[in-house]
Amino acid sequence: MENLTCASSVEQDRFASLNFIISQSVDLITSFFTYMLSIIAIKMVLKQSIFETSTKILLFLNIFYANLYQIVYSIDVVVILYKHFFMQEEVCSLLILESSCAPFLETLIGTSSGMMYCQTGLLIERFCATFLKTYNGKKTIFVGSFIAIVVMISTTSTGKLVIWDDPLDDAVLACFIFPKKSKARSTIHFYISTVVSLFNLAASVALNKYNKTLEYQVRFKICARFHKRQVIESTETICFLNFTQFVFMFIYSSGNSTLKSIRDYIQPETYNFWVVWCYTVPFIALTFPLLLIYKVKSTRGIRAQKIVQISNTKQTQDEHINQMKVMWE
């Protein structure tokens, strides 16, 4: 067992690499910002948004997964930084047994996938809000809770599926690194994550366009128009979040897959330099509450601006009649 945890010369160089330490420090900083931004995002969603209850349930679940991921990942990063500064001479204490890392890795895979599943869940919830004739009260709570339960089950299962038959009889540099014998399955996981993220993005864009076309059909029905505006604002937010998630997930999956496929043809130093910057999951976790805050603020500002414009606009009776005629045409 002692031999397994002894670092090779390449692994020692990676531990000593300034690039590696900078990347880990940046990731650690993102975790602290994620915690603070999440508190602000939760308060804003509760007090300043017009999201349905079902949307709020899934947004909060996504925030939970983002923070849980950052907590577990930051523990791993702190261990790495400690070893870099205080244990570099202890060569046979640098690596960690894969079996010891399994609970951490399952949590990291599960929570990173959970953020993606939450986006899919939000998309399904938006379809319900769009196509169900009545979508309010207890129905929104039921839909949101049901989707959240499905997301949680899927999240718990994903981490176990990726490494379920791996003997975990080797050692790794850090717990966020996939076991060596799960290389093929990790690549499949990357591809599936990219496809799901792309699907989320495409479907949310299509749904957003559909909702905007329907808004004109109910422009003279106040309650119906408010509900449709509520649906549009929520869908626009989900679309915006899906786009950002897709960009980072594409960098993560395509970058890792490409580097793994050419690993035998490039220098270890080159591989180690780039692979740490392809690990963008911490940035997915960070940008979710950040962009959620931005969307709630910007949407609220637009609503306030429209109210001011309406209150400041003075029309004659003829102008009002002409405007009504144009709207009916």
Swiss-Prot record:
Q: List the molecular function annotations (GO) for this entry.
A: G protein-coupled receptor activity; olfactory receptor activity
Q: How does it sit in the membrane?
A: Multi-pass membrane protein
The record, for InterPro entries, names:
7TM_GPCR_serpentine_rcpt_Sra, Nematode_rcpt-like_serp_alpha
Q: Which residues cross the membrane?
A: 26-46, 60-80, 141-161, 187-207, 231-251, 273-293
> Which compartments is it annotated to reside in?
Membrane
The Gene Ontology biological process terms listed for this entry are: detection of chemical stimulus involved in sensory perception
* Annotated Gene Ontology cellular component terms: membrane
Q: Which UniProt keywords apply?
A: Membrane, Transmembrane, Transmembrane helix
| Membership in a protein family | Belongs to the nematode receptor-like protein sra family.
Protein name as it appears in the record? Serpentine receptor class alpha-8
Name the gene for this chain.
Answer: sra-8
